[in-house]
A protein has these predicted regions:
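A positional/architectural concept
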Residues: 1-47, 53-55
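Conserved small/polar residues in nucleotide/adenosyl-binding loops
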Residues: 93-95
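Short, conserved catalytic or interaction motifs in soluble domains
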Residues: 49, 57, 75
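Mid-chain, well-packed structural core segment of small domains
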Residues: 64-91
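Helix-adjacent hinge/juxtasegments
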Residues: 54, 61-65
């Protein structure tokens, strides 16, 4: 079994998500994409507007739209602070 991380997503209005079963996070930063796996080194990043890709331990993909913000990675925990976030609707995604 792959190592897993905790992910928290917070906006000024709500605590949108807390998951303890995240295997991979693809952050959309202002300087490009950064992939995060368990045991990643500490990191603080400025997020750009766009979609973050999350993958849980069962290989299910979750897409999360954020309007910028910050990400902190430390001790197998990823915290996303953003002014606005929404889970992507699968019906809106063209594959």
């Amino acid at each position: 079994m792959a190592s897993l991380m905790t992910l928290e997503v917070l906006t000024p209005d709500q605590y949108l998500m807390k998951r303890k079963d995240i295997a991979y996070v693809l952050l959309n930063t202002v300087t490009g994409g950064i992939g995060i796996l368990a045991n990643h080194g500490p990191l603080i990043a400025v997020l750009g507007e766009g979609t973050l890709k999350l993958q849980d331990g069962n290989n299910h993909v979750i897409l999360l739209y954020v309007e910028g913000g910050f990400a902190e990675v430390k001790d197998n925990k990823v915290i996303i602070l953003t002014p606005k976030a929404e889970l992507a609707e699968l019906s809106l995604i063209h594959i």
